[in-house]
Amino acid sequence: MDDDKLLSGDKADDEEASLEKSLRPQTLAQYIGQARVKHELGVYIEAARKREESLDHVLLYGPPGLGKTTLAMVIANEMQVNIRTTSGPAIEKPGDLVALLNELEPGDILFIDEIHRLPKIVEEMLYSAMEDFFVDIVVGQGPTAHPVHFPLPPFTLIGATTRAGMLSAPLRDRFGIVEHMAYYEVADLEDIVKRTADIFQTSIKPSGAHEIARRSRGTPRIANRLFKRIRDFAEVADQDAIDEAIVARSLTYLRVDDAGLDETDNKLLRTMLEYYDGGPVGLATIAANIGEETDTIAEVVEPYLLQIGFLKRTQRGRVVTIKGYQHLGFPYPENK
């Protein structure tokens, strides 16, 4: 490949990366949706800045794709401090955590995604770091082993999780600010889609933005992903603006139905109806039947089906509701 093509490709990649980065809001004012969460965080941030203190530790929990990582970045911008990001599985041993904490300046933010997946020994080390801003680690082995005391600057830990129930009580109780991220309203998702279209310099009609928003499962990440794919279909069709018709055609190709359910969602419901009479059936059994991990079903697939009332949990397992039956066109049994 010649140099011109290499340079051209690099430039295109840089432009695409820049566009992706620009999708992330920088301030609470730019952040669309989650009005209650934004208002509360705005109060806490303003109070901390007035007192010239670090913000209290923050726990953000809710389904994936709702903007927890983005909100952590926004908090750092609003506090005018640096942020270091990592994830629970990436911190395998206490030394990894100490290395991260050692790089923090006073007031900085450490963001840990999937914080429920921290190893127990690392989690326990966080207790003193969060409460008293120090950690003790044992250096050496055998007779020469001795504890070393590491004082830390005041900092803010922001933890994000899709499984708040998996956090231990001692860790959860050390977060002074706990915010639940809820699924987005269609109107807020419309605004997000329109903003994304503006950033990508793509014309979109109100009907097109509404249809994308309506089928995005209340999730901004899905709305943006669908927009980019529909933009591809519109481009190939030489369509000047994205309207409801091109959205509908594109989503048919993408196997996203009228309720916003994708192939996996419908496969789960159909499997439960065809093989288990709508349930109750256990999560592990469902996972084995549709070829998905139980964590994927519990964290990604199931929450929205519960939210829209197509599925419900019972002590004996998951059960498809009458709305779920109706969605797939199955008759609802009289003995249910």
From Swiss-Prot:
The keyword Oxidoreductase does not apply. Transmembrane segments: none annotated. InterPro entries: AAA+_ATPase, AAA_lid_4, DNA_helicase_Holl-junc_RuvB, P-loop_NTPase, RuvB-like_N, RuvB_C, WH-like_DNA-bd_sf, WH_DNA-bd_sf. Gene3D superfamilies: 1.10.8.60, P-loop containing nucleotide triphosphate hydrolases (3.40.50.300), Winged helix-like DNA-binding domain superfamily/Winged helix DNA-binding domain (1.10.10.10). Its EC number is 3.6.4.-. ATP binds at residues 23-24, 65, 68-70, 131-133, 174, 184, 221. Residues 1-11 have a biased composition (Basic and acidic residues). DNA binds at residues 313, 318. It is found in: Cytoplasm. Mg(2+) binds at residue 69. Residues 1-184 are annotated as: Large ATPase domain (RuvB-L). GO terms for molecular function: ATP binding; ATP hydrolysis activity; four-way junction DNA binding; four-way junction helicase activity. Residues 1-21 are annotated as: Disordered. Residues 258-336 are annotated as: Head domain (RuvB-H). One of its GO terms (cellular component) is cytoplasm. GO terms for biological process: DNA recombination; DNA repair. CDD domains: AAA. The RuvA-RuvB-RuvC complex processes Holliday junction (HJ) DNA during genetic recombination and DNA repair, while the RuvA-RuvB complex plays an important role in the rescue of blocked DNA replication forks via replication fork reversal (RFR). RuvA specifically binds to HJ cruciform DNA, conferring on it an open structure. The RuvB hexamer acts as an ATP-dependent pump, pulling dsDNA into and through the RuvAB complex. RuvB forms 2 homohexamers on either side of HJ DNA bound by 1 or 2 RuvA tetramers; 4 subunits per hexamer contact DNA at a time. PANTHER family: HOLLIDAY JUNCTION BRANCH MIGRATION COMPLEX SUBUNIT RUVB, PTHR42848. Has 3 domains, the large (RuvB-L) and small ATPase (RuvB-S) domains and the C-terminal head (RuvB-H) domain. The head domain binds DNA, while the ATPase domains jointly bind ATP, ADP or are empty depending on the state of the subunit in the translocation cycle. During a single DNA translocation step the structure of each domain remains the same, but their relative positions change. Homohexamer. Forms an RuvA(8)-RuvB(12)-Holliday junction (HJ) complex. HJ DNA is sandwiched between 2 RuvA tetramers; dsDNA enters through RuvA and exits via RuvB. An RuvB hexamer assembles on each DNA strand where it exits the tetramer. Each RuvB hexamer is contacted by two RuvA subunits (via domain III) on 2 adjacent RuvB subunits; this complex drives branch migration. In the full resolvosome a probable DNA-RuvA(4)-RuvB(12)-RuvC(2) complex forms which resolves the HJ. Belongs to the RuvB family. This is Holliday junction branch migration complex subunit RuvB.
